[in-house]
Amino acid sequence: MCIRDRSSNPEVILGRVYLENKVGHAAQRYFNQNNSNRQSMGATRGLVDEYLCIDGRPIYTGGNEGNYEQNPNFLGYGKWTELENRDPRLTQTICRPGEHVTIYQGGVVDKEKNGIKYPDLNYNASGSTVTGYRVIKHWMGDIVEEDRTTQGIQAAIEFRYGELLLMYAEAKYELNGTLSQADVDLTINALRERAGYDFNKYPTARLIVGNEPTDPRLDKIYAEKLDYKISPLLREIRRERRVEMAIENRRYEDLMRWKAGKLLTVPLRGMKFTTVQDLYDGTHTTKPEIAQQVELDKTVFVDEEGFLICYPKSPYQNTIKGTLPWEDYRYYWPIPKEELVMNPNLIQNAGWENR
């Protein structure tokens, strides 16, 4: 993701390159500001929870809500433990505590001066993240690229081989109602091995058709939000797509294709919040980060389980206590009003008539 010339990455099938002082962009500049400014971007707990553990099994392997059986490899919802023993792609997507996530502050690009900000939870202040899960995927940490401002030349990957494998797996399953082990090895297991799973140490990390892992947490969400049932194998195909393509602008279109828009109504949550004493600076010590005094029910808000509620006071009124609205008419786009005026025989798509 962090390349200037797509030709240096054999996985890239279709990409865009930019020319310094001719055609550029501000992606790194905005990414850095959005990752550390009042735009407050961050990954959701829903995404983080979907990453498997290093043994290829979910964080919960049995039981029911309120009494789930926890995977021994899952070390719990602690800032210093949650990302450990997980699918290697998790820490290729989300910052570990102590990693640099910004080198821009007050118009000055200086990695050493600005230091490390993680998680910096104040959802409505400069230098913050709304979820606590800072994104590292796509981030170059390159002072030169930052200083180019609107003339950045980081290449844009539009289509890559990893996505092709995921498309192949999904299409074959939808066509045949199943997937052969050979196809799973060619696609999902190939992606897992490339990511860093150790199949020799953890044989269960290799997906086996007919022996898919149980995931009571995710199955419960699907049962509540979807009006159709999916098999364990299809669940794993969709999981693989979500984690492999995370933060690559594919999720919304995937949900529309799967007729799974109601998954957008799963409450948006962030990391588990404990106390201010858990927030440290970049020294990897117990030194408190004085600059980020976080007050419960004032600068951050949590649910009954202690997880951060995202955008609890959204000025845009898009959320209700961290929950997005959804109506099925949104599976279709509205016909533009000017088209309706030009052709009175056109009928607006249902649900959009008065919007």
Segments from the language model and where they lie:
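Acidic/polar-rich alpha-helix caps and helix-coil junctions
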Residues: 3-30, 61-355
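C-terminal/domain-terminus segments
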Residues: 28-45, 107-109
